[in-house]
């Protein structure tokens, strides 16, 4: 299911029947069209349309692009940062290890959403609103990545403590290999399996975090398609009869996260 969604989002221009962000293909006359199986529904809009007359199916496919881009990029950033700190802490030890682990423990007490909100708030205080809107995706990637790295650091450190006492590491030291080469050429490949497991789970959490931030209005700007943004605007019409504007993006997000 995940690869089907990924394929559709990458080739949205081919898969989606409409481009919902092209003014020429959107008409307000089509606004609030219900799904095809409901009274008043049309086959040209299988899942109905939103308040702007945009096809819901096409909008969700285009919106999943941002969620997947932010999810993948933020997890890669968190994995690089966390693995680097975890391996070096486990291999070097001493005060450096204590500092890294205490920092990890402190951050793990803070929920990821709150940490991402904090980083986003700091970014808004430093740069102008216009610049923030232009760099919203990069701010989101950094904010979510900063909130997710401790899990990678703890797993990497624990695995490194086991690996550094094995014979191949001792042999590498004897032949004069540098610590950097030992850590990232010999130890890292042997601890990748648990790291990739954490990354798989973290990707789903990153996508949900991005959608949550966009739903709260602190993620991508309203002009940028995102599943969280779609749910946010559809929420205004949930109890006025146009339930499909929120329902389908929410179901799509759940399926994407679980897949």
Q: How would you describe each model-predicted region?
A:
Residues 2, 59, 101, 117, ...:
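Residue-level recognition of transmembrane alpha-helices
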Residues 5, 87, 116-121, 144, ...:
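Transmembrane alpha-helix boundary and packing residues in multipass membrane permease domains
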Residues 12-20, 90-94, 119-128, 201, ...:
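Short helix-capping/hinge motifs at transmembrane helix termini and TM-loop junctions
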Residues 60-63, 67, 88, 122, ...:
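Amphipathic alpha-helical segments that mediate coupling or scaffolding at interfaces
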Residues 119-122, 144, 202, 209-248, ...:
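Glycine-rich helix-loop "coupling/hinge" segments at transmembrane-helix boundaries
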């Amino acid at each position: 299911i995940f690869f089907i969604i990924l394929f559709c989002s990458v080739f949205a221009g081919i898969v989606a029947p409409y481009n919902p962000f092209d003014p020429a293909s959107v008409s307000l006359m089509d606004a609030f069209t219900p799904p095809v199986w409901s009274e008043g529904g049309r086959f040209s809009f299988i899942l109905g349309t939103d308040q702007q007359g945009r096809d819901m199916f096409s909008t969700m496919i285009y919106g999943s692009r941002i969620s997947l881009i932010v999810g993948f990029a933020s997890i890669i950033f968190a994995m690089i940062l966390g693995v680097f700190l975890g391996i070096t802490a486990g291999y070097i030890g001493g005060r450096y290890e204590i500092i890294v682990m205490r920092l990890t423990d402190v951050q793990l007490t803070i929920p990821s959403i709150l940490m991402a909100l904090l980083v986003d708030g700091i970014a808004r205080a430093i740069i102008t609103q216009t610049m923030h809107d232009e760099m919203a995706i990069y701010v989101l990637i950094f904010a979510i990545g900063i909130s997710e790295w401790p899990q990678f650091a703890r797993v990497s450190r624990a695995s490194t403590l086991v690996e550094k006492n094995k014979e191949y590491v001792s042999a590498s030291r004897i032949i004069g290999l540098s610590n950097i080469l030992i850590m990232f050429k010999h130890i890292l490949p042997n601890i990748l399996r648990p790291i990739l497991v954490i990354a798989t789970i973290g990707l789903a959490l990153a996508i949900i975090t991005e959608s949550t931030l966009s739903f709260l209005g602190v993620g991508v700007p309203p002009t940028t398609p995102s599943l969280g943004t779609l749910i946010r605007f559809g929420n205004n019409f949930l109890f006025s009869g146009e339930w499909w504007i929120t329902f389908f993006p929410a179901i799509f997000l759940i399926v994407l996260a679980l897949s």
